[in-house]
Amino acid sequence: MQPFLRALQSLGALLVLFAGMTGAARALDLSQAVILVASSSLAGSIYEQTVILAAPLPQGGHVGFIVNRPTSVKLETLFPEQAAARNVAAPVYVGGPVLSRAVFAVMRKAPDNSADFVSLMPGLVAAVDGSTVDRVIEKSPNDARYFVGLMLWAPDELDDEIRNGAWEVRPADADTVLRANPSGLWKSLEGEIV
């Protein structure tokens, strides 16, 4: 019976190892948008307990938005001249430290199917220039989540951060990105097995 138990334990260990390798290989497939969940190695940093949508850029690298950092600032504070901004009850989010004075809008689809939007993934687009954000505010202000700043990675930089254990990688989906109440989002995703 002992040899059988040892063989069974070895098989179990191999299955666990194989599952870990499969997860690691999948985690490093960054050719599609992913959700990044801050690992415990980021404790004490500005990225502690962050959840980020990261999407590949055509020329390499990635762009992203922190999706669980709402501010106390309302859109009307940033756009007092736009009456439609007063109707947006949701707060503006901190999207990241890059271009921290710029406002971006992320939504499920571009209003009027405009080409002035960047596709982040199927079902999510971003308005990244001021005139396009203005149009979103005027035409469909409550259909977007607004971010101040964004995340930006050079080619291979995000791969390196993941390999060094900074981020856990999850499949991206629009519902996670646009979740109405992001408090508790990190906790619900951290350590989740995918």
Over which residues does each language-model region extend?
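N-terminal secretory signal peptides that target proteins for export/translocation
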Residues: 1-5
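Bacterial N-terminal signal peptides
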Residues: 8-21
